[in-house]
Design a protein with these regions (language model features):
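Short active-site segment of divalent metal-dependent hydrolases/proteases
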Residues: 43
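Metalloprotease/metallohydrolase-associated module, dominated by Zn2+-dependent proteases
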Residues: 1-10, 17, 25, 31-35, ...
Length: 167
């Protein structure tokens, strides 16, 4: 699947997902969500999630299917907790250690009745941070009207985010 984040010229950004079969879903997004969604792509790719946000979209879910009334698979809820910790981390002066990160994930999951998740390793945390940072820089540098394209799942080397200008 190809993730396309378009920086709005006269309005909000849009997120579009073009599936392997050519079908697509899209939505306008609040300014908070482009980096949040890029973090989802990094987390889901590095940790191998296939039933979290982008995995569900790739399997046919519409972006509108993620309304609060729709029950999500456990993996999607776990991914949202993990992405939320990365979102919190962005506001900190330094990244969390693996021990801190895993403790926060554990507390978040238990607080939501989601049980436990395996230990996330230092190399996995580093890789997610690298991808998020690379893609966030590309998003920030994108001109209004431009589109950032990222494959999902990201290849092991992270692939390259392609920025293009809209006509």
């Amino acid at each position: 699947m190809m993730i396309q984040l378009r920086k709005g010229r006269d309005g909000p950004a849009t997120l579009a997902c073009v599936r392997a079969d050519g079908s697509r879903t899209w939505s306008k997004v609040h300014p908070f969500f482009p980096v949040h969604d890029l973090t989802h792509c990094a987390v889901e790719s590095v940790l191998g999630f296939r039933e979290a946000f982008f995995g569900l979209v790739a399997s046919g879910w519409s972006l509108d299917d993620f309304a609060p009334r729709v029950p999500l698979p456990n993996e999607a809820r776990q991914a949202e907790c993990i992405v939320g910790i990365f979102d919190l981390e962005r506001a900190q002066p330094a990244p969390y250690s693996a021990a801190q990160f895993n403790e926060m994930v554990s507390a978040s999951l238990q607080g939501q009745g989601l049980g436990t998740f395996r230990h996330i390793t230092d190399p996995e945390l580093t890789r997610v941070r690298e991808l998020r940072s690379q893609w966030s820089r590309s998003w920030a540098a994108l001109e209004l009207g431009g589109t950032l394209e990222i494959p999902f799942p990201a290849p092991p080397d992270g692939g390259s985010a392609a920025a293009r200008r809209s006509a």
